[in-house]
Swiss-Prot record:
It comes from the Bacteria. Gene3D superfamilies: PRC-barrel domain, RimM. One of its GO terms (biological process) is rRNA processing. It comes from Stenotrophomonas maltophilia (strain R551-3). One of its GO terms (molecular function) is ribosome binding. This is Ribosome maturation factor RimM. Belongs to the RimM family. Binds ribosomal protein uS19. Keywords: Chaperone, Cytoplasm, Ribosome biogenesis, rRNA processing. InterPro entries: PRC_barrel-like_sf, PRC_RimM, RimM, RimM_N, RimM_N_sf, Transl_B-barrel_sf.
């Protein structure tokens, strides 16, 4: 699958809201309401069935987003969708700003130190609140703060490489 055709997981249906077909939606976008900007959605049910949806809209409601999907008007339909994952094609996301990256684009890149020591590949990233952390898996797992330019010196997609200023023994 080409990179721009890859599916990016943005959220999940976590329940019904009220009795008129509104949906409680968990979003992993930043900000979380940005999920509504990226459409069409590819919905994947827990049993693997997929459908495409365009026209989802919603609002913030504290812990979750509350969404409305075209054609869904009752709670029973929503409850049957519990656990459904919301994806978009990578091409639906706008290009990131300079020195900003989508985590999914970093996954799988090789990681080397500024001295050329191979540490492994980017497995995934997570946020600590203070900064993001890149998890590198190689001969062992390392967690490196994704802080530009202090620890992460460069990201080169053409070379499939992230260069870090990091002690390979740490």
């Amino acid at each position: 699958m080409k990179d721009n055709e890859r599916r990016i997981l943005l959220g999940r249906i976590v329940g019904a809201f009220g009795v008129r077909g509104e949906i409680k939606l968990e979003s992993w976008t930043e900000p979380r309401s940005a999920i509504f900007r990226y459409q069409p959605w590819i919905l994947r049910s827990p049993n693997g069935q997929e459908s495409t949806l365009e026209g989802a809209r919603g609002r913030d409601s504290g812990k979750h987003l509350v969404a409305r999907f075209p054609g869904i008007e009752d709670r029973d339909t929503v409850e049957a969708m519990h656990g459904t994952e919301v994806y978009v094609a990578r091409s639906a996301l706008p290009p990131p700003n300079a020195d900003e990256y989508y985590w999914v684009d970093l996954e799988g890149l090789d990681v080397k130190t500024t001295e050329g020591v191979a540490l492994g590949q980017v497995s995934h990233l997570f946020s600590t609140g203070a900064n993001d952390v890149v998890v590198v898996r190689g001969d062992r797992e390392r967690m490196i703060p994704f802080v530009l330019p202090e620890f992460v010196k460069s990201v080169d997609f053409e070379a499939n490489l992230v260069v870090v200023d990091w002690d390979p023994e740490f």
